[in-house]
């Protein structure tokens, strides 16, 4: 049996790169689309203006907006959003239809 080769760092010894511009913009569009399903558009517009005044039209501003929207959506889902099963106690376990093995009650 042969051993797997060990993984080596990049030849130029540079640190890992940040995600590319296109990737950040794509993620921002996706998360904004999701946020519009759950939050008032006026709130999102105000948040966007706030980020723009702090960071301008930069990738750092886009990353900050992504971080804030991710946290807001997570908290919203945990609080029991009707569009999500995250954080909901009602409805039961989707695996409950599978019978429990004997002796595991």
Swiss-Prot record:
Region (Disordered): 1-20, 85-105
Cross-referenced Gene3D superfamilies: 6.10.210.10, VpR/VpX protein, C-terminal domain
Single GO BP term: symbiont entry into host cell
Keywords carried by this UniProt record: Activator, AIDS, Cell cycle, Host G2/M cell cycle arrest by virus, Host nucleus, Host-virus interaction, Modulation of host cell cycle by virus, Phosphoprotein, Transcription, Transcription regulation, Viral penetration into host nucleus, Virion, Virus entry into host cell
InterPro entries: RetroV_VpR/X
Compartments it resides in: Virion; Host nucleus
Keyword Cell cycle: yes
Basic and acidic residues bias (residue ranges): 10-20
Keyword Transcription (UniProt): yes
Domain of life: Viruses
Any one GO CC term of the record: host cell nucleus
Residue numbers of Phosphoserine PTMs: 84
Quaternary data: Interacts with human UNG.
Function: Stimulates gene expression driven by the HIV-2 LTR. Prevents infected cells from undergoing mitosis and proliferating, by inducing arrest or delay in the G2 phase of the cell cycle. Cell cycle arrest creates a favorable environment for maximizing viral expression and production.
Protein name: Protein Vpr
